Amino acid sequence: MVERGHGLRCRLTQVAALTVVVVLAQSLGAAAAQATPPSWTEGEHGSGPPAFPAGESRAELRTPPIPWSDLEPDDMWAKPAINHVASRHGWMRDVPRDRRGNWRFKPDALEKRKWWARAMGRAFAPGAEPDPSIRFSDLDTADPFYRWAAIAVQRGWITRGPGRTFKPQNAVTARVVHRSLVRALGMRTTAADIDKLATRDGRRFDTPRFFGVNLLAMRLGLRFNNRFDEAQDVTPDTKLRRKQVAWSLFRATTLDSWVVPYLEDQYAGMELPNMGAGRRSIVRWGIRYVGYPYIWGGEWGFETPSPPAFGRQPGPGFDCSGLSWWALRRDDGGSWEISPPRPHEGWPLPQRTSSAMSRMTKKRLAYVDLRPGDLMFYDGDRDGTVDHVDVFVGNGWALDSSSSVGGVTLMWVETGWYRDHFVHGRRIVPLPRP
């Protein structure tokens, strides 16, 4: 299964490269993994692989959008998504016109569970009928939203609460929205398999709830990475505004057809090598933040203490070097007033940026020499400047936070963009003595 998956992964990687050939053309002739790079200058904004293609179809571009009366300038990033899910399709057209005949979307209102159930039903099962045996203690069968709630529960998109409650007025979280969409896209089994992440000897990691869903949602681009207003970035437990939900539904319904099978194959049989307690602790600590957003200068998984190294951040999240710092660095009583609550103490890593980390090593590692816990450095635009770093966890996988993907994931780095742009590695965690 793993060998088959690896072969198909390589073939699909080639297909993906053809799809984004304009973006990747500059990298095709370069060396994949050089152990002795040139002298690196100071770092630049973190990079990452191109996002999977998705967007408006040609037919949609010919469809005149509804002139929404309540979209503000800071909502413009969501306008294509809103037009797709509420203008062309009507899946999220939940608010009637006002007295003047103006259409409203209420982009900043929290999305209710009953609205989300209806949007999912309209998008993925418009002709379905509910199982009459599904009942709710807080939603009568005569309620117009009952049908959609029952269909959502029947298909496993949304679950009932204690006492057969649906809680129709409650707001949805990112975790709930992303689970609905991952399952609607047919990736339920893949997400469940990812939840069982283990080392070769069968020792499973204590993955957080919906770990597989969070990982696949990041890879699918279901959460918008707001680079210009990072205060709007969300974690898996954030209650979502309607414009954020619109983006998730937009992405899920406009992905190229090869993306889902590509990801299903890539994560099939994912397994990490056997490792000691220290390295295992790094992985266990890192995976709890999968699904957290990319924040430039971000280095904390909770509200920023003072003084942080890169200034106060708008919310929990990490840039690439911040995630590596957070996972590996030992508290020296200097930059961190509060030590992260990790099970491992950490190791000396005084540098904060990817380029500074890349320079401060006496031995630069080639890809074949990497071991779990090693840092991997990349030159995303091939200008002689390291602009990305992640933490290798073995068997071709790395704990990564990139601006293009939009946050923290476990990424396949043995082929594709990561291998093409890899320059060298650095060992922070000493190898065990023979």
Can you describe what each PLM-predicted range is?
Residues 2-35:
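Secretory targeting and sorting signals
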Residues 293-318, 371, 378-421:
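Glycine-rich catalytic cores of cysteine/serine-nucleophile enzymes that process amide/ester linkages
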